[in-house]
């Protein structure tokens, strides 16, 4: 079962994303900011990270930069969801907010199948 880490500072959206991915058959963990997400990735590397870009403590761009700088996490596919898509430069795919759940699942599925090959 693919493991997905959802990173968003909005608890309601995090809950909703968890439910969507769980119903699609994925094991899901979540974090409320980039710093908590880094700790989660180091504890148990996910198969995919789905992250917001604008968060407190550590924002999405910094979180992605740190993931990419560590050999153990550099190849984890990253799907950025953001109202400001130019912030997601190092992500493997970007879905602008607002987005449709079906499209989110489709892009996430492609990243899980092909890894970072979509870049």
Model-derived features: positions:
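Short acidic/polar segment at the start of the alpha1 helix of CheY-like receiver
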Residues: 10-14
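Charged docking surfaces used in two-component/phosphorelay signaling
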Residues: 15-23
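Acidic, metal-coordinating helix/loop segments flanking the phosphotransfer/catalytic sites
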Residues: 30-48
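Active-site residues of response regulator receiver
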Residues: 52
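Receiver (REC) domain active-site loop signature in two-component systems and cognate sites
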Residues: 55
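Hydrophobic/aromatic residues positioned on beta-strands within the core alpha/beta folds
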Residues: 79-81
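C-terminal output helix
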Residues: 99-112, 116
